[in-house]
Amino acid sequence: MTPQRKRRLVMLAALAGGVGVAVALALAALQQNINLFYSPSQIAAGEAPLHTRIRAGGLVQDGSLRRAPDSLAVQFGITDGVQQVLVRYDGILPDLFREGQGIVALGKLDAQGMLQADEVLAKHDQNYMPPEAAHALKQGAATSGGTPAAEPQP
């Protein structure tokens, strides 16, 4: 093999290795930023991973909101019409947050099945609800024989 071919082969191998490392780093970064959506029924069935950041969406269950008197900690239940999941959040809730309203909570599921949320997003209209949440609410209503709970709240 001539020195020129040897140099080209080394350059090509270095380039292929660099591209491989770049792709591996990009995939690792994307893996850490993916937040999969789970409905309360999926969480109750054990389909959601523990101690991994997830998104959970549904309607805030009427009568479930509990506020700590000496802090910003709140606890409430979200439902898809079939199952309920408790959510604990330390922080200021969005202005549009209220019972019966659609929300998406981002956080980690603990061993007791409670979502320890670090972010709560309130939805004021079904048009802004993630498709997964709307589908879960419609599916829950069909299972329970009721009307879909994804109707907008006035």
UniProtKB/Swiss-Prot annotation:
Region Disordered, annotated ranges: 130-154
Subcellular location: Cell inner membrane
CC per GO annotation: plasma membrane
A Pfam family recorded for this sequence: CcmE
TM ranges: 9-29
Major localization class: membrane
GO biological process entries: cytochrome complex assembly
InterPro entries: CcmE (IPR004329), CcmE-like_sf (IPR036127), NA-bd_OB-fold (IPR012340)
Segments on the Cytoplasmic side according to the record's topology features: 1-8
Family in the record: Belongs to the CcmE/CycJ family.
Function according to Swiss-Prot or TrEMBL: Heme chaperone required for the biogenesis of c-type cytochromes. Transiently binds heme delivered by CcmC and transfers the heme to apo-cytochromes in a process facilitated by CcmF and CcmH.
HAMAP family associated with the record: CcmE
Name of the protein in its database record: Cytochrome c-type biogenesis protein CcmE
Originating species: Bordetella petrii (strain ATCC BAA-461 / DSM 12804 / CCUG 43448)
Gene that produces this protein: ccmE
